[in-house]
């Protein structure tokens, strides 16, 4: 799994949490949950309100990432999570992208799949509030979909 050669990547993800060694909640085996910023929905009972916060603040010298938010490219995320490679391989686990709405980061997730290879499972915990084109883009690389249908009442 370990490779000294980095793949060229072009996309970054804004992340507010990386939660390691999860079992039984975010897909098969042991997983790491990567919580992404941003969601087009504003559900009254959202479990991850943090995803709606501003990513940047304006300062005297430009824009700054707000406290607790990191931006990583696919290689950098891999470097953060590869410590659990043995757990992922032994249990059939891998990475679960959630947070916010992971389909907003489709190109980043594609790049992450290229970086991590096909041994780890990739799970999306999603509302599927995205275009059909995005689903078609992600379908070949996502192993498991956790579709979170909170309520079909348009008022909520």
Regions found by a protein language model. Name each.
Residues 39, 102, 151-152:
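Short glycine-rich anion-binding loops that position phosphate/pyrophosphate groups of nucleotides
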């Amino acid at each position: 799994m370990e490779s000294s050669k980095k793949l060229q990547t072009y996309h970054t993800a804004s992340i507010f949490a990386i939660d390691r060694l999860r079992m039984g909640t975010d897909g098969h085996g042991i997983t790491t949950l990567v919580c992404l910023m941003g969601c087009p929905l504003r559900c009254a009972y959202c479990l991850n309100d943090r995803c709606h916060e501003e990513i940047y603040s304006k300062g005297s010298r430009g824009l700054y990432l707000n406290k607790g938010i990191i931006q990583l490219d696919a290689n950098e995320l891999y470097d953060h999570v590869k410590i659990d490679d043995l757990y992922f391989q032994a249990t059939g686990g891998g990475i679960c992208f959630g947070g916010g709405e992971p389909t907003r980061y489709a190109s980043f997730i594609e790049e992450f799949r290229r970086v991590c290879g096909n041994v780890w499972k990739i799970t999306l915990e999603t509302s599927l509030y995205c275009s059909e084109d995005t689903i078609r883009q992600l379908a070949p690389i996502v192993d498991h979909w956790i579709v979170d249908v909170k309520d079909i009442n348009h008022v909520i």
